[in-house]
Amino acid sequence: MSEETIVNCPTCGKTVVWGEQSPFRPFCSKRCQLIDLGEWAAEEKRIPSAGDLSDSDDWSEQQP
């Protein structure tokens, strides 16, 4: 007997069973999934970084 893992939808907070019966997991629906994607695309959400933008100077494709 296996226990079902239950998570909350990150968008609306509804409970979602983490399993094949929930194709949009961790979201409860396609709508909540698209709302989250839109927030990332609009840069309302971001992964915090301690890096300085000057660190990317070494990544330049231009040759000195």
Curated annotation (Swiss-Prot):
InterPro entries: DNA_gyrase_inhibitor_YacG, Znf_NHR/GATA
Gene3D superfamilies on file: Erythroid Transcription Factor GATA-1, subunit A
Organism domain of life: Bacteria
Sequence segments annotated as region (Disordered): 45-64
Single Gene Ontology BP annotation: regulation of DNA-templated transcription
Ranges of Acidic residues composition bias in the record: 54-64
Binding site for Zn(2+): 9, 12, 28, 32
Function as written in the Swiss-Prot or TrEMBL entry: Inhibits all the catalytic activities of DNA gyrase by preventing its interaction with DNA. Acts by binding directly to the C-terminal domain of GyrB, which probably disrupts DNA binding by the gyrase.
Subunit structure: Interacts with GyrB.
Stated family: Belongs to the DNA gyrase inhibitor YacG family.
HAMAP family, alphabetized: DNA_gyrase_inhibitor_YacG
Name the record gives this protein: DNA gyrase inhibitor YacG
